[in-house]
Structure formats: structure tokens, C-alpha cells
Amino acid sequence: MSSSAPDDTQASRLDADQISTRSSSYASDNDTDSTETRIQRNKEKQAIRLLAFISANIIALACGSIVVFSLYAPLLQSRLHYSQFQVNAVAISGSVALYLPISGVGYICDRVGLKPLALTGGILFGSGYGLAAGVYRKLDLEYRSHPEYRVDNDWSLPFLMLSFVFVGVATCCLYMAAVSSCAKNFGKGRYRGLALATPITCFGLSPMWLSQAGTRLFTETRPDGSKGDLDVFRFFLFLAALTFFMGILGTFTLRVVDEDELIDEAIEELEQSGLLDGSSLLGRTERSYGATGEETESSALLDPSKDNAKWKKNWVLNAETRSFLADRTMWPFALAFLLIVGPGEAFINNLGTIIGTLTPPEMEGWSHRTSAATHVSIFGITNTASRIFIGTLTDLLAPYPHTQHVQGPSTRSAVSSRFSISRVAFMAFFASMLSIGLLILASGLVQNHAERFWLVSGLVGAGYGAIFSLTPLMVTIIWGVENFATNYGLIGMLPAAGSTFWGLVYSATYQNGANKSKAGPEGSDRDDLFCYGEQCYAPTYWAETITVWIAVGLLLWAWKGRGGWSQRGIII
């Protein structure tokens, strides 16, 4: 008996060692499986993020079609016999619809998601351009069939305006979905400026390639076989099909990866910076833990984890929206954006008719040395180059905070001691560049010298593009990425007022000049539709130049003024 006891003890130890070995083996296997699972999940997330990035850029490359309005604006005058006021009414409808709903679109984007916006944008694009094609075709055929008497075109204006309202809202939806996906998916990286600038750049490229496609692929054929004017009907049908497909593409590919983690990080940083009181959020969580059995059972049926996550997200986003609106520096920043972008929008909308005022009617044959398509392309090239250039340059030279959330007085956002240039300085520089382009036009330097007009379209395009790239980037850096679409939407809706105001001012100036110059073709009963000379545009662009200078002053005040970003320690 005594000899068997040590044997039993030894056997027990062997069994324990084997169990321990097996447990360690199982634990090791579990750790390996867990690591492999994490790696696989990270790869899947990277693939989704990359697909969303590529899709966002493709969509942005196609959805800037509203900017090529000046390509066919002269044909609305010559073919549909619209006055300058009527042409601008159509242009203003599109511009207002592009900017005015952007705050609501941004709100939906942050709280509902990207897919509904993409689908809505695709449907509205197809409907808008389809309606515009039908209206243009019907009225054009009526004028061709009855050239001997005046056709009533009053019925067409409301329908054409409605079609461009659809196009404007669709542009807003797809643009916000594309830019927001990049802002939220790449908000942590050192090169977030480049990631955000890429879809914005593609949006700037859009009018360039679309204008060239229109003038090369969708033109009428003259009796001698040469290319004639743009075939607006076919061009509208092409845009309807292209943009509708972009909406479908975005519906299936645009996603924000790890949005829940983004919200949790935002809560933590906001509480640390003192910008947010988490007591109400904690109270909500404690109530869910202290629920009765009956409440727990009912909540389980409603999936309380999802309900709490959604409530928490909305709570944080609403708190950030209130903080954004209460920030006194936001208002001069938004007003500066309005005063800069308004003149830029009015310029591109009226580019075609401006070119027509530069050359005397008796030299009409020589006017083909420059065209609206050429300058839409020049505007597009400089617009695009400045967007991608400013995104890259600010990543390399501008200071950057080590956070993707709202910057507060206590935010720990250390910055390197390397040489840096503030993004505000870049914004002021490019706004001044835009004002120089407007000044050249206002001064009459290009009058009777249409070959010099590239200076105007190039400078305005470069300034306009840089401002549109820097503004959303500064919104993400100062006020965070999680509520980006809402915050940027509140600022982005303001240019609707600027575009409308300057469009009306230009129309009044142009029409007044037309009444004086009587520059229409001889024997025409439409002499008052066309204008030639500095009086057609100079007063408008002198005023626009001054407003851009005022905007630069507002930017500098928001940066260096009392209670400005510099005094508050905000890295920008």
C-alpha cells in the first residue's frame, strides 16, 4: 500500500502536466486563430476602405457636370431665344439647388449614411438631365420648324429651371457622399489632406473632360460635313445616363469603416478637452444596466446594443453641431467662404456670355480663336491642379494636430518644430489670386483681346479650386471628422446666396449694356439679347474684386483676431 501511493502521486503529476500542456497548446492555437482573424478582418477593412476611395473619386469625376453650364449657355440664347435674365434664371436654379440643401444633405450623411444619398443623387441626375433634354429638343424643333414667326418659349423656362434644380440637388448628394467617405475613412493619416483633396480634385477635373467630350463627341454636323455647335440634346442624354450610373455605383460601394470606433474616440477626446459633459451619456448607460427583467426582455427584442449605439452617435453629433454653431470664429470663416465662392460661381456660370462681349460683332469670324469650351477646360485644369496641389502642399508644409476630432483649449495636439505655413495663409493667398483674375477682367485688359482671357479663367480657376479644397480640410482639422458633413454643409450652403446675388447683378449689368450697345446681328429683332463692350461686365467684376478682398480680411481676423484660432491654440 505504501509503495502504491508514490506511484499514484507520480501518475497524478503526469496527468496534470499533460493537461497543462494540452491547455497551453489550446491557448496557443486560440491565440494564433485570434491573430489570424484580426489580420483577416484588417485586410477586409482595408479592401473596403480602398474600394470606397476609388469609387468616391470615380463618382466625383463624373458628378461635376453642372459646372459645364457655360458650354451650352450661349445656345440657350441663340437657339431657344432666351434673354440673359432667363439664362441666368436657369443657372441660378442649379447653383441654389447645389448649395442651399447642403446642410440638410450633410445632416443625413452623418446620421443616416452614404448609400441613401448616392441612390437619391443618381435618380435626380437621370431625371434632371432627361427633363432638360426633352424641353430643349421640343423648343429647338419648334424654332426650326417655324423660323418666320416668334415661338412662345415662356412655358419652357419653369421646366428647365426645375430640371436644373434636380441636377443641383443630385450634385450636392453625390459630392457630399464622396467627400465624406474619404474624410471619415482617412481622417487619422498624416496625409489626410491629400486623401480629402483627391475627390475634390476629381470634381474639379469633371468639367474639363466633360466639356471636351461634349465638343468632340456630341456636335452637330454642318451641310459641308464639318463640325457645328454642341448637340445639347444628345449631350444631356449622355449626362443623364452617366450620372445615373454613378449614383448606382455609390449605392453599392461607398462605406465608412469603423464608424462606431470613431464615435467612441470622439467622446473620449471631447470629455478630456472639456468640450463635452458625459454625464447624460453615462446616465443613459447606467439606466440600461439597471433595467428590470421585463424591460431587459423588451429591449432585447429591439436589439438594445444597436439602439444605444445609434443614440450615442446622435447625441455626440448633435453636441458637436451645437459647439460648431456657438464657435464665434466659424461665422467670419463662413462669410469669407461666401464672399470668395460667390464671385467664382457667377464667373463660371457666365463664362460663355462674357467671352461673347469681348469681340466686336463685325469680327464674329475671328471670335472662334477662343471658345467657351476652351476656357471651361482652362478653368478646369487650373481648378484641378490647385486642388491636388494645395492638398499635398499643406500636408507637407502646414502644421497638423495629432487628433482627428474637435480641437479644444485642452486638446493635446503636439506639433513638430519644423518650418510650417498655416493653411489660413494658403487660403488668403489663393483668394488673392482669384481677385487678381477678376481685377484683370474688370479693368478691361482683355477687351478686344480675347486671346488674353486665359489669364482670367486660369487665375479664377486656381483660386476657386484651392478655396474649395482648403475649406473642407480646415473644417475637419478644427471641428473634427465625425460631424464633418453637417458642419461643412452649414458653411457650404452659404455660396447659394452669393451665386444668386452676383448672377442677378451680372444679368442686370449685361442687359443694361445690351440695351445701349444693340450688338445683335443686323436685321435681327433680337438686338437687345446680346451685348458687346466693357459696360456689359466691368461694374459687376469691380464689385466682386472688392468683396474678395473683404473676405481675405475676415479670414485673417478669424485666425489672428481676438479669440481667434491662434489665441486659442488651435493648430491650423
Curated annotation (Swiss-Prot):
Its main location: membrane. It is a multi-pass membrane protein. It comes from Gibberella zeae (strain ATCC MYA-4620 / CBS 123657 / FGSC 9075 / NRRL 31084 / PH-1). This is Probable transporter MCH1. Keywords: Glycoprotein, Membrane, Transmembrane, Transmembrane helix, Transport, Vacuole. InterPro entries: MFS, MFS_trans_sf. The chain crosses the membrane at residues 50-70, 89-109, 116-136, 159-179, 193-213, 232-252, 335-355, 426-446, 459-479, 488-508, 539-559. Probable transporter. It comes from the Eukaryota. Glycans are attached at residues 30, 515. The lineage of its organism: Eukaryota, Fungi, Dikarya, Ascomycota, Pezizomycotina.
